[in-house]
Amino acid sequence: MPEATPLLKVTGTKALGAEVILHGDNYDEAYAHALTYAQENGLTFIHPFEDPMVIAGQGTVALEMIDEIKDLDIVVVPIGGGGLISGMASAIKQIDPKIKIIGVNAAGAPAMHTSFYAKKAINSKSVRTIADGISVRDVSQPNLEHILECVDEVVTVDDEEIAAGILFLLERQKLVVEGAGAASVAAIMHRKFEFAKEAKIGAVLSGGNIDVQMLSVIIEKGLIKSHRKMKLVITLIDKPGSLMRLTDLFRNANANIIQIDYDRFSTKLSYGDAQITIILETKGKEHQAMIREMLNEAKYPFVEEV
């Protein structure tokens, strides 16, 4: 596995009895090392997305979806190496060619997207994305051929869009999904392809191995972007009662104080001033606008951090 593989994935694999070797900055470097290691130690190498049996096995996901959801219009599938979508698209197009197949690349690892529209393999120079499960630099030629034959469209989603998908699934569906798994939902949420309002769309959530620290960052940023948290840096006169008057303002605004830091020693401050960094729990865009207005009316100089 790459050295930056989430700890959850590493420990989970070890718990199943495997020896885990961490090598390289991305999948492709780990893959090259695995090939060498297998040759040097007389081991059998099973390719994670080019092995025909692996591809066929992943195609059964499509059979389950078609069995459970009648009259599917579109199926959206994350793409890393392309094994999952190759198997699924091959199965779907044999059963019902009318079903549209959409592949989703991470914008930070767009090799298959680039290759799909160029109709030839074009590797990425580098990859960087929170969706480590689809962070693949080099294109699989066999899978590209499957994709060109069976997939209707390939789109990309950036890390911000993937993070929004993770947060949506966590909050609305009560599902913990990794970046690679949330890419399909992100493509739907941000309308990366055309679809009718009444369309029946199936999205493949291909994994849940997300690092807890990464998840906490996504949640915190998501709360700020959805106007449910607000971070303010406020300058006030450093004298008894000043902080109480400021907190009274937030109480009157019905904003809950989550964290507060009081600094009177910063060299950027004038003598006699203090700087308050405060994080508030808020109830949306209009609530935050009201708080800004109240601070301006009370003549508190402030900067909002996002």
What is the role of each PLM region?
Residues 3-74, 92, 105-162:
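Small/polar-residue-rich loop-to-helix segments that shape phosphate-bearing ligand pockets
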Residues 6-10, 55, 78-89, 109-113, ...:
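Short glycine/serine/threonine-rich phosphate/pyrophosphate-binding segments
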Residues 13, 46, 65, 75-76, ...:
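Buried hydrophobic positions in well-ordered alpha/beta secondary-structure cores of metabolic enzymes
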Residues 19, 98-100, 200, 256:
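Residues at the starts of beta-strands that form the adenosine-phosphate
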Residues 140-198:
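Active-site-adjacent helical/loop segments in soluble small-molecule enzymes
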Residues 200-206, 230:
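Helical hairpin unit composed of two closely spaced alpha helices linked by a short loop
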Residues 214-306:
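A conserved regulatory-domain signal marking ACT and ACT-like small-molecule sensing domains
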